[in-house]
């Protein structure tokens, strides 16, 4: 268990998540046809900029895996989430970077996007990952490729992904089906 985390009752976790979902729903800005025509973009910036909204989201995400000993945030908004959750749990935080942003050696994984492909990376040395219990965080779960690729990186490094969590899940894109054996929590799920 993390140094500062306390195990909460399921009822308390559900209440915390419901409050965070209300904050996310209230504060998220939606943009049609951004970044390309036909895409409806969820801008979570107002959630992160609002003290109560951000606190609520961080506390909800931290409750997903109080026994994690490392929090990993996916580039780029996952960095904000990861730092807040790691501070809450008393763990370290690791940034899962887009390809080409870390010096070698790296562990890398390519994945497909709606409009092409991309890669994610974590350090290949300098951070001992073997045996670590990782909570993986991202802002939005859409098609699921990004989160699945990030999870694969940690498995390849010998770590265990004990849980993954996102602020917003776009269920109609089916991203949940691409995830591994770890529990996946979404603060707000949109059909």
UniProtKB/Swiss-Prot annotation:
<dbReference type="InterPro" id="IPR000836">
    <property type="entry name" value="PRibTrfase_dom"/>
</dbReference>
<keyword id="KW-0660">Purine salvage</keyword>
<dbReference type="GO" id="GO:0005737">
    <property type="term" value="C:cytoplasm"/>
</dbReference>
<dbReference type="Pfam" id="PF00156">
    <property type="entry name" value="Pribosyltran"/>
</dbReference>
<dbReference type="GO" id="GO:0044209">
    <property type="term" value="P:AMP salvage"/>
</dbReference>
<comment type="similarity">
    <text>Belongs to the purine/pyrimidine phosphoribosyltransferase family.</text>
</comment>
<comment type="function">
    <text>Catalyzes a salvage reaction resulting in the formation of AMP, that is energically less costly than de novo synthesis.</text>
</comment>
<dbReference type="GO" id="GO:0016208">
    <property type="term" value="F:AMP binding"/>
</dbReference>
<dbReference type="GO" id="GO:0006166">
    <property type="term" value="P:purine ribonucleoside salvage"/>
</dbReference>
<keyword id="KW-0808">Transferase</keyword>
<comment type="pathway">
    <text>Purine metabolism; AMP biosynthesis via salvage pathway; AMP from adenine: step 1/1.</text>
</comment>
<comment type="subunit">
    <text>Homodimer.</text>
</comment>
<protein>
    <recommendedName>
        <fullName>Adenine phosphoribosyltransferase</fullName>
        <ecNumber>2.4.2.7</ecNumber>
    </recommendedName>
</protein>
<dbReference type="InterPro" id="IPR029057">
    <property type="entry name" value="PRTase-like"/>
</dbReference>
<dbReference type="GO" id="GO:0006168">
    <property type="term" value="P:adenine salvage"/>
</dbReference>
<dbReference type="InterPro" id="IPR050054">
    <property type="entry name" value="UPRTase/APRTase"/>
</dbReference>
<keyword id="KW-0328">Glycosyltransferase</keyword>
<dbReference type="GO" id="GO:0002055">
    <property type="term" value="F:adenine binding"/>
</dbReference>
<dbReference type="GO" id="GO:0003999">
    <property type="term" value="F:adenine phosphoribosyltransferase activity"/>
</dbReference>
<dbReference type="InterPro" id="IPR005764">
    <property type="entry name" value="Ade_phspho_trans"/>
</dbReference>
<keyword id="KW-0963">Cytoplasm</keyword>
């Amino acid at each position: 268990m993390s140094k500062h985390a306390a195990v909460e009752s399921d009822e308390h976790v559900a209440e915390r998540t419901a409050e965070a979902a209300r904050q996310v729903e209230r504060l998220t800005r939606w943009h049609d046809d951004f970044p390309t025509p036909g895409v409806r973009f969820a801008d979570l910036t107002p959630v992160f900029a609002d003290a109560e909204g951000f606190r609520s989201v961080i506390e909800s995400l931290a409750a997903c895996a109080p026994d994690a000993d490392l929090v990993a945030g996916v580039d780029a908004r996952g960095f904000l989430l990861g730092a807040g959750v790691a501070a809450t749990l008393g763990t370290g935080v690791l940034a899962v970077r887009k390809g080409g942003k870390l010096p070698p050696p790296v562990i890398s994984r390519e994945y497909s996007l709606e409009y092409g492909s991309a890669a994610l990376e974590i350090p290949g040395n300098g951070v001992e990952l073997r045996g670590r219990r990782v909570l993986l965080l991202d802002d939005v779960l859409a098609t699921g490729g990004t989160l699945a690729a990030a999870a694969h990186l940690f498995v390849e490094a010998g770590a265990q992904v004990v849980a993954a969590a996102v602020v917003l899940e776009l269920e109609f894109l089916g991203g949940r089906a691409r995830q591994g054996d770890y529990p996946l929590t979404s603060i707000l799920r949109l059909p």
